[in-house]
Amino acid sequence: MNIEEFFELSAGKWFSHRTSHHLAFKQSEDGKSDLVIESLAADHPEVIKLCELYEVPASAASCGARVSWNGTMEWDEEKHTGSTVLATVPDVDNPNEGRLLREMGYAEKAPVAGRYKMGDDGALTLTTEYETMWSEERLWFASPNLRMRVSVLKRFGGFSMASFTSEIRMGGSPAAAKAEEAANSASS
């Protein structure tokens, strides 16, 4: 599977349940969110605008997505809502790796570019260095309607967090054959 197929398979409405382990505090926290992921073509105006923000030629982008979320975390009463646009810019010599441009980062509320790598097993690994922290996230399809995610967040001062997230598709299912193929390659 390539990055474009991964984004296409991710399109839809998802229920997300995350357990985060705050290692320094030796505590865990649950969170729940509703996610909406919309696949965007490489020539979509929002993808082009994002490329311009990073001074990347729009023609270098291979695909994009708009991700919106609305959720809660166990430790606070605040609603966690937001949205961001993503764009992929594959490396010229290896299109299974490249830059992932984000309109807004998840850990810090500012534009941030990271790296992506599509594995032979159909899993997507994202690595991002923020100003004060580093994150690595791995996403894969366990089945056409179940996506898994594990992540590690490490602050430069030493504080770190590990998370496991399961995402259940609530609507907007992908083409069954592609989704089944992705799930089979991830489990083998």
From Swiss-Prot:
- Superkingdom, taxonomy of origin: Bacteria
What is the regulatory mechanism acting on its activity? Inhibited by Co(2+), Cu(2+), Ni(2+), Zn(2+), beta-mercaptoethanol, and non-competitively by imidazole.
CDD domains, sorted: CpcS (cd16339)
What is one process in the GO biological process aspect for this record?
Answer: protein-phycocyanobilin linkage
Induction or repression: Constitutively expressed.
Q: Does the keyword Disulfide bond apply?
A: no
Temperature dependence per UniProt: Optimum temperature is 45 degrees Celsius.
Q: Pfam families attached here?
A: CpeS (PF09367)
Q: How does activity depend on pH?
A: Optimum pH is 7.5-8.0.
Could you tell me the EC number(s) of this protein? 4.-.-.-
Tell whether Lipid metabolism is among the UniProt keywords. Answer: no
Keywords associated with the record? Lyase
Tell me what effect the entry lists for R149L: Loss of catalytic activity, retains PCB binding
InterPro entries attached here?
Calycin, CpcS/CpeS
A single MF term (Gene Ontology)? lyase activity
Q: How does it assemble?
A: Monomer.
**Similarity-based family:** Belongs to the CpcS/CpeS biliprotein lyase family.
Q: What does this protein do?
A: Catalyzes the site-selective attachment of phycocyanobilin (PCB) to 'Cys-82' in CpcB and 'Cys-83' in PecB. Also able to add PCB to ApcA1, ApcA2, ApcB, ApcD and ApcF, but not PecA. In vitro can be made to add phycoerythrobilin, a non-physiological substrate, to its target proteins (using genes from Fremyella diplosiphon PCC 7601). Binds PCB extremely rapidly, followed by a much slower phase of PCB transfer to the apo-acceptor protein.
Record protein name field: Phycocyanobilin lyase CpcS 1
- What species is this protein from? Nostoc sp. (strain PCC 7120 / SAG 25.82 / UTEX 2576)
